[in-house]
């Protein structure tokens, strides 16, 4: 995207938001299905002529499948902060010419949802037929629907909730501490 992308805890300049598409956008521009990924997948949800390798949702997305690319124009957005092409801590900050590292703003689900809006804007799509997500992607789809209700017709949230449960929060905290306790972590600046 161009310009400054405002986030819950800061901002980044001209972020790259990676995404993949399948199918054709109709003339009315009303057949878009927007998919948000879970925590670890890339935007490569299914194979395509550009990339024939199998995607993580290969059985769900494609011609004649539940998300039918003969009927829908599908956009799968790669989350900000991930290592699959979107701007994140390993990216170069265009303002400083150095890696963001720990200066990258702490991400929120709302930030990821808003990055989906930026992708839709770049494609000239005002409203999606359906927004879909599983796990963290389901939380993102819910956030997208709440923050931008005029931009979505339907919501499908799979294996998700409106907030993280205490067990999940504790597990993620333990995972962060494991990384921080690594002797070569160097406070994240490596």
Regions found by a protein language model. Give the residues of each.
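Ligand-binding pocket scaffold of soluble enzyme catalytic domains
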Residues: 1-190
